[in-house]
């Protein structure tokens, strides 16, 4: 199984440092048109590095940090499947006397937030020991599985918000850039340089292009990682059903 999953108190500063490093190194190494697209450097409307693109980079890296935590969680949950918490042969039948040692082991392997499989096994064993009913145990397991799936979905709320926020910032940056360029052209007292105005307007659209690319990356990674976590939930339910619920003997 994977190690401890970093919390937001660790992820946020690490994500900010990574974003600042990306901006700093990119500013030094990437120049010309690519530098204008990615960083709006040199900027005509903002004191560098306080540009819309750089703000989007910071938000983007925060989203990547959240996804990293979810990816680590998915790896950890998948790792529980191979721990052989339950007998996996075709002959073993479990009675109430057999469940004590199993529960002692799984109780140490889960917490409130992590450990879908040991949590399901622990809860199912407790229900069976208290009710002596396989049907009630199966019903409790199904209810717990639905709650876990809902909890997994809720964990992606911030990532979904960031995937929405990034293109929103891009659109705002583009509108601001277009407005500022047109305002400067309108307030010009000399001859209007059409070429310079067109170049400035083009830079305004770069903000949206970068934002849409970042949003697409976040959504793509979110789909892959959420699928990994949801697969772990389904595998935990299937494992518990096959190797615990279907082996329970009420006699």
Enumerate the predicted regions with their spans.
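Membrane-interface, cytosolic juxtamembrane amphipathic helix immediately N-terminal to a transmembrane helix
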Residues: 1-13, 132-165, 192-199, 226-233
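Large intracellular
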Residues: 2-145, 250-251
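Membrane-interfacial helix-loop-helix connectors in multipass membrane proteins
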Residues: 35-45, 182-202
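Alpha-helical transmembrane segments of integral membrane proteins
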Residues: 49-59, 160-166, 202
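Alpha-helical transmembrane segments
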Residues: 57, 61-70, 171-175, 214, ...
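Perimembrane helix-loop junctions in membrane proteins
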Residues: 67-81, 181-188, 223-230
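Channel- or pocket-lining gating/hinge segments that regulate access to a cavity or pore
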Residues: 138, 157, 189-251
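Bilayer-spanning, highly hydrophobic alpha-helical transmembrane segments
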Residues: 158-184, 205-221
């Amino acid at each position: 199984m994977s190690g401890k999953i970093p919390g937001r108190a660790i992820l946020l500063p690490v994500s900010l440092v990574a974003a600042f490093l990306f901006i700093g190194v990119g500013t030094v190494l990437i120049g010309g048109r690519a530098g204008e697209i990615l960083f709006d450097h040199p900027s005509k409307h903002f004191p560098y590095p306080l540009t819309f693109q750089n703000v989007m980079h910071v938000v983007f890296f925060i989203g990547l940090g959240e996804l990293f935590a979810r990816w680590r969680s998915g790896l950890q949950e998948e790792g529980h499947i191979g721990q052989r918490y339950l007998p996996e042969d075709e002959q073993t039948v479990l009675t109430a006397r057999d469940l004590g040692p199993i529960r002692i082991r799984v109780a140490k392997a889960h917490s409130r937030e992590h450990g879908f499989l040991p949590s399901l096994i622990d809860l199912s064993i407790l229900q069976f020991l208290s009710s002596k009913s396989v049907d009630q145990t199966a019903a409790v397991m199904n209810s717990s599985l639905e709650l876990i799936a809902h909890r997994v979905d809720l964990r992606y709320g911030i990532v979904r918000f960031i995937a929405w926020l990034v293109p929103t910032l891009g659109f705002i940056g583009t509108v601001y850039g277009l407005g500022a360029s047109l305002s400067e052209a309108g307030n010009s007292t000399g001859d209007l340089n059409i070429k310079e105005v067109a170049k400035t307007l083009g830079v305004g659209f770069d903000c949206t292009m970068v934002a849409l690319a970042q949003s697409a990356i976040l959504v793509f990674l979110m789909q892959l990682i959420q699928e990994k976590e949801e697969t772990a939930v389904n595998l935990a339910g299937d494992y518990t059903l096959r190797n615990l619920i279907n082996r329970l003997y009420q006699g």
